[in-house]
From Swiss-Prot:
It comes from Clostridium botulinum (strain Loch Maree / Type A3). This is Shikimate kinase. It catalyses: shikimate + ATP = 3-phosphoshikimate + ADP + H(+). Pathway: Metabolic intermediate biosynthesis; chorismate biosynthesis; chorismate from D-erythrose 4-phosphate and phosphoenolpyruvate: step 5/7. Binds 1 Mg(2+) ion per subunit. Its cofactor is Mg(2+). ATP binds at L11, S12, G13, K14, S15, T16, R119. The keyword Flavoprotein does not apply. The keyword Hydrolase does not apply. Mg(2+) binds at S15. Substrate binds at D33, R57, G79, R137. GO terms for cellular component: cytosol. It is an enzyme of class 2 (transferase).
Length: 170
């Protein structure tokens, strides 16, 4: 499958870079959180509040199964999608996985700066929770095909496209 799958912590830039990558490569963009919101006709925050995290993770599994039939897509995942149910291995079968590795200090800055109601697991004052999440997830994220360690937007795009072309043998 020739998809690019962006994984990483909340606030790592998956959605933003995904939009630009899809334009550059002329691939359709799929945002897994947006798909779930459309399926449920509710925001992620509402889904968590009404049905709980387990229900949300089941929906993510359904999305992964649908994605197995897709090609030439840029897929931006929710931060937890690769973590649960060993989904990272399923994602690697679907396409080229890219871990957008952002230093914890930068994620904390972004969290404090961005008051975002859409992220049910993050509150703008909960740096301890973010630190714990980072520690618990990093090992799985690092199983991606490539790791982009860059907070510069343009350089990240260039690095992703280069790594993807190398993976494809172009």
């Amino acid at each position: 499958m020739e998809n690019i799958i962006l994984i990483g912590m909340p606030l790592s830039g998956k959605s933003t870079l995904g939009r630009e990558l899809s334009k550059i490569l002329k691939y359709d963009l799929i945002d897994t959180d947006t798909l779930i919101e459309e399926m449920e006709d509710k925001s992620i925050k509402e889904i968590f509040k009404i049905y709980g995290e387990d229900y949300f993770r089941e929906k993510e599994l359904k999305i992964i199964n649908k994605l197995k039939k897709e090609s030439n897509k840029v897929i931006s995942t929710g931060g937890g999608l690769p973590i649960y149910n060993k989904n990272i291995y399923e994602l690697k079968k679907i396409g080229f996985t890219v871990y957008l590795k952002v230093p914890l200090e930068e994620l904390i800055k972004r969290m404090v700066k961005k008051e975002d109601d859409a992220r049910p697991l993050l509150k703008n004052d909960d740096t301890k929770f973010l630190e714990e999440m980072y520690k618990n997830r990093i090992e799985i994220y690092e199983k991606a095909h490539t790791i982009i360690c860059n907070t510069n937007y343009e350089e990240s795009l260039i690095a992703i496209v280069k790594a993807y072309k190398k993976w494809k043998g172009i």
